[in-house]
Amino acid sequence: MNSPVDPGARQALRKKPPERTPEDLNTIYSYLHGMEILSNLREHQLRLMSARARYERYSGNQVLFCSETIARCWYILLSGSVLVKGSMVLPPCSFGKQFGGKRGCDCLVLEPSEMIVVENAKDNEDSILQREIPARQSRRRFRKINYKGERQTITDDVEVNSYLSLPADLTKMHLTENPHPQVTHVSSSQSGCSIASDSGSSSLSDIYQATESEVGDVDLTRLPEGPVDSEDDEEEDEEIDRTDPLQGRDLVRECLEKEPADKTDDDIEQLLEFMHQLPAFANMTMSVRRELCSVMIFEVVEQAGAIILEDGQELDSWYVILNGTVEISHPDGKVENLFMGNSFGITPTLDKQYMHGIVRTKVDDCQFVCIAQQDYWRILNHVEKNTHKVEEEGEIVMVHEHRELDRSGTRKGHIVIKATPERLIMHLIEEHSIVDPTYIEDFLLTYRTFLESPLDVGIKLLEWFKIDSLRDKVTRIVLLWVNNHFNDFEGDPAMTRFLEEFEKNLEDTKMNGHLRLLNIACAAKAKWRQVVLQKASRESPLQFSLNGGSEKGFGIFVEGVEPGSKAADSGLKRGDQIMEVNGQNFENITFMKAVEILRNNTHLALTVKTNIFVFKELLFRTEQEKSGVPHIPKIAEKKSNRHSIQHVPGDIEQTSQEKGSKKVKANTVSGGRNKIRKILDKTRFSILPPKLFSDGGLSQSQDDSIVGTRHCRHSLAIMPIPGTLSSSSPDLLQPTTSMLDFSNPSDIPDQVIRVFKVDQQSCYIIISKDTTAKEVVFHAVHEFGLTGASDTYSLCEVSVTPEGVIKQRRLPDQFSKLADRIQLNGRYYLKNNMETETLCSDEDAQELVKESQLSMLQLSTIEVATQLSMRDFDLFRNIEPTEYIDDLFKLNSKTGNTHLKRFEDIVNQETFWVASEILTEANQLKRMKIIKHFIKIALHCRECKNFNSMFAIISGLNLASVARLRGTWEKLPSKYEKHLQDLQDIFDPSRNMAKYRNILSSQSMQPPIIPLFPVVKKDMTFLHEGNDSKVDGLVNFEKLRMISKEIRQVVRMTSANMDPAMMFRQRSLSQGSTNSNMLDVQGGAHKKRARRSSLLNAKKLYEDAQMARKVKQYLSSLDVETDEEKFQMMSLQWEPAYGTLTKNLSEKRSAKSSEMSPVPMRSAGQTTKAHLHQPHRVSQVLQVPAVNLHPIRKKGQTKDPALNTSLPQKVLGTTEEISGKKHTEDTISVASSLHSSPPASPQGSPHKGYTLIPSAKSDNLSDSSHSEISSRSSIVSNCSVDSMSAALQDERCSSQALAVPESTGALEKTEHASGIGDHSQHGPGWTLLKPSLIKCLAVSSSVSNEEISQEHIIIEAADSGRGSWTSCSSSSHDNFQSLPNPKSWDFLNSYRHTHLDDPIAEVEPTDSEPYSCSKSCSRTCGQCKGSLERKSWTSSSSLSDTYEPNYGTVKQRVLESTPAESSEGLDPKDATDPVYKTVTSSTEKGLIVYCVTSPKKDDRYREPPPTPPGYLGISLADLKEGPHTHLKPPDYSVAVQRSKMMHNSLSRLPPASLSSNLVACVPSKIVTQPQRHNLQPFHPKLGDVTDADSEADENEQVSAV
């Protein structure tokens, strides 16, 4: 055999690594560099491989590794072929990539093969498959464009430390509203991040490291989850906390910022991976893209509105948008918007060109790459010089392109760009250059897009086979076709005939080796088929003949079929193995029994499978027997010893060791049931299993030290490993097999069952899969110490139906797979056959029923993530590559794309599963626990590299109906919100999901991986729709090549199987999982917790397996609701809108008390918030946060407070009226990128006090748009009242302020965004905003000892939602009463310049008035600039309970205490906290502004917002601390008493009264205990109001306007 390996490279590879010279290493590197299968590796990786790889040659029929072998290396096949995991591997190909854990499958060398063996890295070594993270050596160079359009080139040296702190993608996208954690404002000159300070386009990691360290070290002991979590939860939390976040560096930006001369081949490859999906590069060849990437310059525009190109300006570059949006204003008035991936600028010519129109940025932080005119022209025109056109009869039939894959010159050649279908078929047998090594695979996958029938290719191949020089090439093509796409042949009679004819040609030409490989491939890839036959009577002939039987060691095979018979017409053919007949298993049945069954039935439903390989082995054995030639004896007569070529792992039956008449396991290729056993004899292609240990050979090692058999309250028995080999087997002594350390996993006792007695005592028995019931009885009798022979006992299964019916059955002696068969509602009992006692009492039956009823909170989050990932991965890996093509090109294939559709549906199913679980739980505390549970599951899915389920869970948590449950979310511990935020950050949609893609291609992301499937579909769809299928009448094969590459990358993610035993724990390899022998999950395996033993402890094994069974049963019986309207109704039922409050709130309070968290009662210092209410008719709306008025709620240092932002409100006309409207939903929490994120993009989470900004008016939205107020700071945002003219409307938002007489006091102006209906995309469950009208209400308050009572005024209760500025807690005990008495307004008017406790006025937007959140946020009093740590990207927040745990005595607030008393009432720690200081100011117009700034950098604050017009921001230096005597609050007691006199709503007030007397004040509720703890920020006077008032008010009707 001529070796394809370069002799020099082979000689160098044969040397031991320490003996290799630099010349040897360079020779090996050059050879590896030229291999296409290694083209994705960078130079440093190939250098490492050159030092570690070695050359090896293996003979045929040799076992390379077994399923139990620990993975320590991987292979590159250079010649020959191997069979692994049911697939034939042909050169050049790599296989066996796995890091740790057992192989999980066998690998057989089919013919003499050469391979390169690459050792896995040790713990202290760098992995070859991990990309290098070198210190940055080159200078960064990019251009900045300021607001005026002036360009500045930034060239600097970057410190290594600053670069190593960058997480994965890091551009701050304008659409992701506030991705950063908050820090105090730092000027650009003081910024610690060189990238942010230099470029001005913040990389989302600017402050990531600081917040990680600051928050991570904070004491979490005061968080409320402590009393809730169990010990297991705490240990699991520790594991979660120790988990390394999936953060990486922004490699793409690093490459972009390099000088063109500094860009390496690795940099260009990195840019190519990113750029090839942008529309601007569509229909360009790969060589053109490569050249463009090598010369592109990076540009950043920091501000929106910056002019990039003026009208009439000379053009000198071609621009491609990487991030942001630009607007081109043409001279004719036409406006054109361009988005990410679009291009503008010059055309490929050297002529002078001028800009027509003005190009300006629409958002902050726009990023571009630009290519100079000279380079652009040169590259695009150079393509013509590199192309070669093939003409026939004057027509172009093929276009080649000369391509260089790198600058080394070693990888260059011609590649087909486009051609006619005939020429593409012809090219199959032509020589393929090094730059196009996958042409055959690409063609066989994509031919279906331009050929009507595969037979067109088959006919040509049969013709070429007759030519001797082409025979080997044709055979390789057919082998690849069968191995990669066997579904093209199954079910297609024409292609089946082609395959039969090709086999006959191989036989005629004596190409037995190739024929054997073809048979193996067919057997490994074949799937079960259904054939239905009808016989006229039992005596009718079968029309086909049989062979085989278990007595021969084979299954039942079809030996011949009568031509033209019904059997032939039904698809039955020679070589088919019959797997089942009418549901009866035929895999291990005698020949006579099989014939009897077939003859005695007139209706035959056959399940068959093509297994020509084993069928020929059967014929060979039969011929040997007839000729009298002795054959190698079958090894033992154990079913478990029959090994065959199979494509799906499964179980192998094993009969009893004591069985006198032993049944022999058939040589089958059964799919899905039998374990893969491809062990072949060296001298003959037999299917005999090498087994090394003799009878009981391992039994002596099965002591307590090995399996952990220490008795724990229950007795324990271990089944001995049955002997399986006869010592007379001569073939076991052959060198090939005697060196193997092979054992059948089904023989390993790694499962545990629990057996009960009548008196309910139990013992644990460690068994294997094939242990029989009789053997279990024997050991159970021994363990229980029973007298009498084991024959007098039997094993019974007792089960209880949900209705309580007890079922009992005796199990047959040979019954096996006992651990897998037992259900949750069943038990195994040891029964005395001589007695008739009741095994399971009614009480025990009820206990069984209870145990079988599962709830989400009973399940282990690790186990749920494991089984979820296992289930999804099984679906994912079963997707045929052709299904992607059929789905993409909308082809009607015979096989269909059922697997693809099922996997596509997973995201929606799992998303609605999350919502169903949360919303079907009535108890609020349990709802919080379920949310916490799902966050843990998502974290574990991340470790399993199951991004699909992780995304689905995040999407479910952000559904509108879930996100609005404010009271539930506020109970969630802060650290889980941070965990959720970290998960959501992975799916940041900036730069085409760059962060997620960076993680996916990072060093730890080795298979198995379940990718985010919507992104996979999007990428393929872009490649399809962004490139023409035909160019100039020729098939665009460059497009097909790119699609094939994408599909190969997806399929490569399934190249290793998931091993549930290696994910998080050392548990049973087979128990509790559908496929036990699976490969390790690299990077996802937890170190075992100390309390879990790595030894096989019987009780622990049983508990783990029981949990796995519970999870499987739970997942299989899920009843998922998919109606979002029902979700909304359930959500409102648990946390209703305030418009639905009843007259008496005592029932609600009593219900809340049952849910009360065990957290200690809050003191007076732990205040909650007064919430303004904004009604909305629809269920999903976008809202703005309210400033927290009294945020001193000590829940722990890292507990992020619910955010409320006091917004200036706009007074509406008095003629507008709303009454009796029910508002079903509240506000949406913070908005991220509605423009570009996918519909379910989890850009932010539903968190307390966060709102969603309407994208239509959020162009200028920056960190100043929102603020988050620390729960530890004393912050008040109060405004006095003043008149504002309608002329003071905002220019951008066109909002109007109605004129109000000066006597009304302060008027806060609010602008409302109008762009809600403009959203082109929104997440699941989003609805459009329809702002309703409501009158402004006067509000004053009185608080009783029992709770904050109805002296509060409620606007018509809208479901304002979690964290919205209109929100109100359902458990805040705030009753609201309208104050119709104009005198109370008059009274308040006298305090126009006096400090008031709360916001003064509140209004709602009308349908006709725009609603601009960005401006209204900027007008917020006391607002600190800071991005929101938690964002909601799909749903509205709820008008739910603000703080459910706030119970107990609540003091009334009156105004009789002194300012000193007020300050004394503060908690000492909060009052004296030096971090935050409150600034109080009085302006000329009577507006009082309280701003909070911080003297040091903090993780929650970034910078204060710009001071709005009409407001005066006061710096700390200008202010003296202490009370301000000029700020005297009004005496509220008078207003309170007057408010009780009348119950008219404001709607009854005359217009003049309202227009002149509109003042609103909503005080915060304060939960108090002893009076000394009362917190009264900025209230100079405090007093008491009698409890009688509160009790009397409690039964009054809540009035809503």
Swiss-Prot record:
GO terms for cellular component: apical plasma membrane; centrosome; cytosol; endocytic vesicle; plasma membrane. Residues 412-526 form the N-terminal Ras-GEF domain. Isoform 3 has highest expression levels in the brain, heart, liver, lung and placenta and is barely detectable in skeletal muscle, kidney and pancreas. Residues 1-22, 179-250, 1192-1274, 1302-1324, 1455-1478, 1571-1601 are annotated as: Disordered. Residues 228-241, 1586-1601 have a biased composition (Acidic residues). Residues 749-835 form the Ras-associating domain. GO terms for biological process: microvillus assembly; positive regulation of GTPase activity; protein localization to plasma membrane; Ras protein signal transduction; regulation of GTPase activity. SMART domains: cNMP, PDZ, RA, RasGEF, RasGEFN. Gene3D superfamilies: 2.30.42.10, Jelly Rolls, Ras guanine-nucleotide exchange factors catalytic domain, Son of sevenless (SoS) protein Chain: S domain 1. GO terms for molecular function: GTP-dependent protein binding; guanyl-nucleotide exchange factor activity; phosphatidic acid binding; small GTPase binding. This is Rap guanine nucleotide exchange factor 6. Residues 530-615 form the PDZ domain. A nucleoside 3',5'-cyclic phosphate binds at residues 280-399. Interacts with the second PDZ domain of human PTP1e.
